[in-house]
Amino acid sequence: MEMAESIPCNSVVGGNFKEVSPEKVIRFKPPLYKQRYQFVRDLVDRHEPKKVADLGCGDAKLLKLLKIYPCIQLLVGVDINEEKLHSNGHRLSPYLGEFVKPRDLDLTVTLYHGSVVERDSRLLGFDLITCIELIEHLDSDDLARFPDVVFGYLSPAMVVISTPNAEFNPLFPTVTLRDADHKFEWSRMEFQTWALHVANCYNYRVEFTGVGTPPAGSEHVGYCTQIGVFTKNGGKLSKPSVSQQCDQHVYKPVYTTSYPSLQQEKVLKFVLVGELLIQVDRLRLRYQRMLRDREKDRGPKPGDMDSCPAPHLLLGAVFTEAEKARIESSPKPFCEGEKFYIPLQRLLTYPKLHRLCADEDRVRSLIADSVCLSSDGSAVVVDLHNSWDYRPEEN
């Protein structure tokens, strides 16, 4: 992260620019909100949570950034502004590319309208709850209730709370609250005193850090945004503890969407068949090339595909030595008349197909109604030639 820059602030009076020398504008690179979001993303990278909730999610920008993480399977946003949730839910919808190249694991994203100081059992058992620039918007009554709801009732494995550092404010042109809706802004001592008390009451430990490094010469004020990272002692709640909680559904669902994933059989089948047909066609074209080479009396015999020079580099495929060895040791494709047979065992040695599904029986059941199989089901069968083939020798 770069330090903040101090830039002279100009005002406009009667259409003329006037320099206001005592005042400085602080500009962060990257912008401060992006630094806060990046802090959360770094935590997700390190801890790989499966269930994440953002309290006070606002326009859902953080959720949009988090939905790309393969470890997350449930992503929830809660906000008091229902209109904002309605207008930003579309940000979280799957893109077309996420259907073409789906996730490995399921992901459900839900936005709830409600107050962060209300108890809703659908947020129990989460790995990470984020409260980014939230607590300063709570009045004194809600702030008093906040710890018991988030740390006592929801009791996630980790909580991240960020809030403005009031000690940084004198560096800004206007030494007032940074937002008209802020009910308070704490110094580092005030925030840390509150956070340590909360951690002690609810069996958490807390570490303090921040984002928004001050300009040179002002290091004594600390970060512009102060952050507390709370980690529950002993890890997550045990499953019995979560299950003992009574169902309380006080939040109103505003938006929900589910992402396609390879855990869904229809999606797996679609991707598997597509990748299999690509590999089959590569092998078919390669076999044709060897036939042409043989006809010109300068290449290998049709049955000896692997003696072809650099066979693994055909059509851009790149394999490790171990992958090459696994492919070469598998049953080879063969031709009977105008029919080309590619054993399933062979196909499943190719990395992309192997990653999708390594179980031959399951692959057979998934593709049976989409491709032609041999009578014993051991091989995919296609025509050796088709009308789309490019045959340069005929031109």
Curated annotation (Swiss-Prot):
Enzyme class, first EC level, given as a word: transferase
Subcellular location: Cytoplasm
Residue ranges the record marks as coiled coil: none
Record's keyword terms, sorted: Cytoplasm, Magnesium, Metal-binding, Methyltransferase, RNA-binding, RNA-mediated gene silencing, S-adenosyl-L-methionine, Transferase
Cofactor: record remark: Binds 1 Mg(2+) ion per subunit.
Residues binding Mg(2+), per UniProt: 133, 136-137, 182
Gene Ontology annotations of biological process type: piRNA processing; RNA methylation
Keyword Endoplasmic reticulum in annotation: no
Molecular function terms from GO: metal ion binding; O-methyltransferase activity; RNA binding; RNA methyltransferase activity; small RNA 2'-O-methyltransferase activity
Assigned EC number: 2.1.1.386
UniProt cross-references to SUPFAM superfamilies, sorted A to Z: S-adenosyl-L-methionine-dependent methyltransferases
Positions bound to S-adenosyl-L-methionine: 79, 115
Pfam family, one: Methyltransf_23
Enzymatic reactions: small RNA 3'-end nucleotide + S-adenosyl-L-methionine = small RNA 3'-end 2'-O-methylnucleotide + S-adenosyl-L-homocysteine + H(+)
Gene Ontology CC entries for this record: cytosol; P granule
Major localization class: cytoplasm
Tissue: Specifically expressed in testis.
Names of the cofactor(s): Mg(2+)
Family designation: Belongs to the methyltransferase superfamily. HEN1 family.
Task performed by this protein: Methyltransferase that adds a 2'-O-methyl group at the 3'-end of piRNAs, a class of 24 to 30 nucleotide RNAs that are generated by a Dicer-independent mechanism and are primarily derived from transposons and other repeated sequence elements. This probably protects the 3'-end of piRNAs from uridylation activity and subsequent degradation. Stabilization of piRNAs is essential for gametogenesis.
Name of this chain's protein: Small RNA 2'-O-methyltransferase
Lineage: Eukaryota, Metazoa, Chordata, Craniata, Vertebrata
Encoding gene (name): Henmt1
